Amino acid sequence: MESRPWFVTKQLEDGVYLISEPPHVNSFLILGDHDAVLFDTGMGIGNIKAVVSELTDREVLVVNSHYHFDHSGGNKLFERIAIHESGVKPLSEDVPPEWLTAYMDFSERMLEKFKIYRELDEAYFHLLHVDMFPRPFPSEFDPSKWAVVPTVASRALHEGDVLDLGRRALEVIHTPGHTPDCICLLDRRSGALFVGDTLCAGPHYSHLPDSDVDASAISTRRLATEFYRDVNVVYPCHILRYALDPKFIVEVADGFQAMIEGRAERDLGHDIFGEDAGRYRFNRFSIFVPPAWQPDASAPAGTTEAER
């Protein structure tokens, strides 16, 4: 595989930069006149702070979308770290080593499959571009010694908090479901919605031990009803996509609603760790639920298509 930098950086709009670790995860640097927010710090495999320093000299506050290791791996490089109040404790706890081992195993399989994918794309489809290609690990990184250092948050965030960066304000929206501490950040002036793992153009992991399917349905419905008209672009964190149209919010909310009401078809899926999950497939995404989870026929009907 060709040698390329671990991180891909791209200016998405005025004062907003993508810092991607393709195809693993996206982080976003958001600049105001006097301060900056780094929304997630990625895997902790490369030095994301060095990348940030090349883009800005403003004081940086890390805001974790949630506590998972693929979003907080670079926290150790920063002093100012904020997370929703319900994520403070798990952020400070050790990441189970088996999670990291399983992720490395998945990464190896993914790299092998990508070679086939790239060959097919070059022959037939022509959809990939160089920014999507997986990178080799940095020379200083030893996969066998990969560890995500627990970090202590310097600030606990709450629903409705506003982060004033100077001529840019980011509103904290608590969106539990994937994890209890999931948040989104909304810049009402530009219409940018940074969604972490609340919205994903791929599998939504609602089957994990601290996931809550009903909470995910409520959170996505809330985004689609209370905030939809304020959104011009959605910035997600996974699956080789870093910008989505606002209608995607509605699609996901309607998908969760259809699933809960028993109006969606289900099959068997497997997550990146090889664990079984119930899988619901939709046009631009899927939803994983615990194998024993069942729809609730008494759930209230209604879709955002009507509400809009």
Where do the PLM segments sit?
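Accessory terminal helices/loops
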Residues: 1, 135-137, 202, 218-308
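Short, solvent-exposed secondary-structure boundary motifs
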Residues: 1, 17-21, 143-147
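Residues that act as N-cap/strand-start positions at coil-to-secondary-structure junctions
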Residues: 3-4, 13, 22-24, 149-151, ...
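Conserved beta-strand hairpin/beta-sheet module of binuclear metal-dependent hydrolase folds
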Residues: 5-54, 185-200
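Structural signal for conserved beta-strand scaffold positions within catalytic alpha/beta enzyme cores
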Residues: 11, 18, 64, 82-83, ...
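Metallo-beta-lactamase
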Residues: 35-36, 43-44, 145-148, 154-155, ...
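Active-site HxH/HxHxD metal-binding segment of metal-dependent hydrolases
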Residues: 45-164, 201, 247, 251-266
